Amino acid sequence: PTGPADADILVTLTPGHQPTEQYVHDLRLKLGPRFAGVDFSFLPADIVSQILNFGLPSPIDIQVTGYSLQDNRRFANQLLRRIQMVPGTADLRIQQPFDQPHLRINVDRTKAQLAGFTQRDIATNLLISLSGSFQTSPTYWLNPKNGVSYSIATQTPQYRLDSLQGLENIPITGASGATPAILGSLASIQRDTGMALVSHYDIQPVIDIYGSVQRRDLGGVADDIKKIIDDSRKELPHGSEMVVRGQVLT
């Protein structure tokens, strides 16, 4: 998995099974209609395919690199739609989704300062409630009977943070002895979206378009994709680059 919304499903076939490609083809036809809004992709399962892909999850990898992420994202979406028209392509997707649900917390620094809190105080209290105190102040207890050290962490139970109201009720304390307050009195919470995965290549942000082939040779698909890429280069945002990697190059 590459993000919190991803999962791997491993399937082991019993002796005497049919060709694996047939199972993959049937699953591609059935999974999409039954699970709307979910993207499925089949990664190379055997070591030979993994080596031929140079460690990539798909034989086709089109990278769009550059610092203008929003422009690159729009370009990548347009390019993806064009490549989806190529016969024989499968599992086409953008590896870095931009629609991961986020909650944006905007702290009113004036209110926080008047109440005796700093931005660090609020961030630390949030981190303790959401991820546990082990992230900010690790604590250990040594069992004198067996000599083993155990980590001790405090964290707000999940059922107390299952709503925006629960998040707003997170207690905030400061190191300067300020009167404790709740998050809702010092900050506002807004629903937002953002990147679920941030990738870089040679320091620059990168967007990967991954794809596989189905019931067509990789060379034929690669030729069609190359024509689309050559035609799309004139639409590439200023300062960005587009590179093809993976088994498709061999």
Feature map (PLM): residue ranges:
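Flexible hinge/switch segments at interdomain interfaces of large molecular machines
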Residues: P1-D6, S41-P59, Q63, R93-Q100, ...
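Short, surface-exposed ligand-recognition loops at beta-strand->loop->(often short) alpha-helix junctions
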Residues: H17-Q18, T65-N72
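Extracytoplasmic/periplasmic membrane-proximal domains and adjacent transmembrane bundles
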Residues: R73-T250
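Short aromatic/hydrophobic contact patches that present stacked aromatics
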Residues: D8-L10, D61-Q63, R104, D208-Y210
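Solvent-exposed, membrane-proximal periplasmic/extracellular interface segments of envelope transport
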Residues: P1-F54, T110-T136, K145-N146
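Hydrophobic side chains in beta-strands
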Residues: V11, F42, V64, T154-T156, ...
